From Swiss-Prot:
HAMAP family: NamA
NCBIfam families listed in its UniProt record: PRK13523.1 (NF010047)
Keyword Nucleotide-binding: no
Function of the protein: Catalyzes the reduction of the double bond of an array of alpha,beta-unsaturated aldehydes and ketones. It also reduces the nitro group of nitroester and nitroaromatic compounds. It could have a role in detoxification processes.
Protein name: NADPH dehydrogenase
Catalytic activities: A + NADPH + H(+) = AH2 + NADP(+)
Cofactor field: FMN
Binding-site positions, FMN: 23-26, 60, 102, 214, 306-307
Assembly information from the UniProt record: Homotetramer.
Keyword check for NADP: yes
Family of this protein: Belongs to the NADH:flavin oxidoreductase/NADH oxidase family. NamA subfamily.
One Pfam family from the record: Oxidored_FMN
Protein keywords: Detoxification, Flavoprotein, FMN, NADP, Oxidoreductase
Length: 338
């Protein structure tokens, strides 16, 4: 039987050598607070590429300084960021992996000095209260995502992911729990989708490569979006040309989350089948057998691995051995891998 985890995957002309994706995870390591790539980032991402991950997604990268989660986040709001990102892409490509970047804005969850912005002036838990965005600020943010995509293209990335999850700005617009606007960007689901729809459209004016969106497909709170809402959103995104939905969950408001191995896989499965769009499964996927089951049963198209790759950069090899197969690695490691 073919091991689907190690089969190739083609998306809009980009071929991934396997179905293993390094999920975007903030490293908070831009220690000069300028959003620039540091040596740690390069070694961090290159080591996972050497470990034979098929697609590396660089962590949430802020499209504006105000859109950072912390002062130590990566940024893509300036052309000064391009050279470091270019080197990162080159080091990822050197090992046969493809490179993606997650474009992000933290919204009300930005832990920064000065004012922060969100769809409505509602704080997250005990954090700072944001300013409700003006229409001018909304337009500026949409433009910032477009310019971020253009810089990502110049840096050589193969894929872009838009961060629409975990209670950050786009998620805040999507959710009725955080979006209390009475203008064209609030109210109905269609209106709450307007920001993301316009961001997608603007990015597509400068980027014709694969485009993913990460969503929190469960909000775990009364009055929030339901899975049926996210299926509708996924259908709209497919019509716009989105290639894959990365299905995470939670964090739009403080709420208990029932966590167990593969707990978010049913979200990816439902959206894949109901919206007829490719999905990525993420969340406590820790073994090759578990990942293979998800793919063989057509519950998702790609496997996004997060903390397991922090623990073990060579997890793909471990997964292969568990499945009774072998994969190649850096020739320098042959005496250990063969």
């Amino acid at each position: 039987m073919e091991h689907k985890l190690f089969s190739s995957y083609v998306v809009k002309g980009v071929t991934l050598k396997n179905r293993i994706v390094m999920s975007p995870m903030c490293m908070y390591s831009s220690d000069q607070k300028d959003g620039k790539i540091r040596p740690f980032h390069i070694s961090h991402y290159e080591s996972r590429a050497a470990g034979q991950v098929g697609l590396i997604i660089v962590e949430a990268t802020a499209v504006t300084p105000q859109g950072r989660i912390s002062p130590y986040d990566l940024g893509i709001w300036s052309d000064d960021h391009i050279s470091g990102l270019t080197e990162t892409v080159e080091r990822i490509h050197a090992h046969g992996a493809k490179a993606a970047i997650q474009l992000a804005h933290a919204g009300r969850k930005a832990e920064l000095d000065g004012p922060i912005i969100a769809p409505s002036a509602i704080s997250y838990d005990k954090m700072k209260t944001p300013d409700a965005m003006t229409e001018e600020q909304i337009s500026e943010t949409i433009e910032a995502f477009k310019l971020g995509a253009l810089r990502a293209k110049k840096a050589g990335f193969d894929i872009i992911e838009i961060h629409g999850a975990h209670g950050y700005l786009i998620n805040e617009f999507l959710s009725p729990l955080t979006n209390k606007r009475t203008d064209a960007y609030g109210g109905s689901l269609e209106n709450r989708y307007r920001l993301l729809r316009e961001i997608i459209s603007e990015i597509q004016t400068v980027w014709d490569g694969p485009l993913f969106v990460r969503i929190s497909a469960a909000e775990y709170a009364e009055g929030g979006n339901e899975l049926s809402d996210f299926i509708t959103l996924a259908k709209w995104m497919k019509k716009q040309g989105i290639d894959l939905i990365d299905c995470s969950s939670g964090a739009v408001v403080p709420a208990p989350i029932p966590v167990y191995p593969g707990y978010q896989v049913p979200l990816a499965e439902a959206i894949r089948h109901e919206a007829n769009i490719a999905t990525g499964a993420v969340g406590l996927i820790t073994s090759g057998i578990q990942a293979e089951e998800i793919l063989q049963n057509e519950r998702a198209d790609l496997i996004f691995v997060a903390r397991e790759l922090l623990r073990n950069p060579y997890w793909p090899r471990e997964a292969a051995l568990e499945l009774g197969t072998t994969i190649s690695g850096p020739s320098q490691y042959d005496r250990a891998w063969l």
